[in-house]
Amino acid sequence: MTSARAALAAFAVDAVLVVLFAATGRLSHAENVLVGLWTTAWPFLLALVAGWLITRAWLAPRAVVRTGLPVWAITVAGGMVLRAAVGQGVAVSFIIVAAIVLFVLLVGWRALALLVS
């Protein structure tokens, strides 16, 4: 796989996992997933894009420490800032759960990829 394809694939995995996080969160609160999925996901997706740009993640898209950790941190922090800016909830419990789940997802897949390669 070319480096451009690897980077695009890694970004796609990250984006799908962020949407999965948003969908499971809505399901866990017995909310309609399809109706509110975009409302829940967009702040984290926008923050994910920022994380990729800030860290230049395409240079080492599968790296756990160089890419995974900062992309995760920027996605969580940026997503929460954007949610707060538009009046969405940012309760401490939500911040903690989001940080843990997104860590497992965004850093976890990279760690698994490292283990199997």
Language-model regions, residue ranges each:
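Structural signature of hydrophobic alpha-helical transmembrane segments
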Residues: 35-46
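Membrane-helix boundary elements
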Residues: 2-36
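Small-residue-rich segments of transmembrane alpha-helices in multi-pass membrane proteins
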Residues: 17-19, 44, 70-82, 101-102
